Amino acid sequence: MNAPHLLEKILRGERLSSEEAYALAMSIAKNEIDDVQKAGFLVALRCGRERPEELEGFVRALLDLAVKVGPFREAIDTAGTGGDRANLFNVSTAAAVTLAAMGYKVVKHGNRSVTSAAGSADVMEALGYNLNLPPEKATEVFERTGFVYLFAPLYHPAMKNVAHVRKNLGIRTIFNLAGPLSNPARPGYQLVGVSEPWMLDVFAKALKNLGVERAAVVHGRPGIDEVSPTSTTEVYFVDRDKISYSVIDVEDFGAKPLESLEPLKVRDIKEAKEKFLRALRGEFPEAVFLGVNAAMAIHVIDGKDVSEAYLEVVETLARGEAINKLREIIEASGGNPTF
């Protein structure tokens, strides 16, 4: 790869093919170009807004470099880009645990916080989950419980070669977009939240090209990377090689809209843990937020109507099955529940 030539191409306003993006991501991750060039590429790609082919190429590279586990094609991952600055509790992870309690297979892939008060890994660790699961143990936990949480730094060791560049830049880069799509277990189903509306189309096309079975890419009002519990949510559905667009209202789930996101916000890991547990116990208003997101995931997996799925989620929470599943998952990981 000719780094200066490729950088000039981007600066001329041209974009990279998926093959060029793959080669670039590989060169960055393998330290084949220096830090100045790495920063130049990341900023240049960001300036023109990343394209589906570029995102696809970076994701393919990350997956090829990742520590192998699975694949678990029957599973779903629920993830988001982050960066919405809303500081809401970790609803996608709470929804993932609830899905497992309902019998759905889940492989959650996540990391510590970058922009929020607490990342999914921070919360899982605070709850007692053992993050340090090698592939063999992760497979065992998945087969035993139907759920496993994969701590991204363990499975993407090559990312350490760009970590300091990303930190020093202090801005979102294409790696922030590629992360939610780079689950090393390669689940066939995905619910992905994006922080900006323009990302909807980009993610949907990338997911289609990556060969996902079914997925939903969501952006909720007022600007969150989750299904909104207060208003409407834009959704791009991916069904193998087809992409469709819709807008769904919280009332379509059979839920009463929350008046505000304020009760869902957290300031630190302690609050994040408390609201996470309240959601799994079916307490208001956290359970509404969990419910609409879990229902959307169920719709992705089996096409069930979101109102029917929402009711099933609410009943699961009321029976205490989600909180019990969380204990089971933590114990299977070799951890000790802290609640």
Curated annotation (Swiss-Prot):
Anthranilate 1 binds at G80, N111. Anthranilate 2 binds at R166. Mg(2+) 2 binds at D225, E226. GO terms for molecular function: anthranilate phosphoribosyltransferase activity; magnesium ion binding. Pathway: Amino-acid biosynthesis; L-tryptophan biosynthesis; L-tryptophan from chorismate: step 2/5. GO terms for biological process: L-tryptophan biosynthetic process. It comes from the Archaea. Binds 2 magnesium ions per monomer. This is Anthranilate phosphoribosyltransferase.
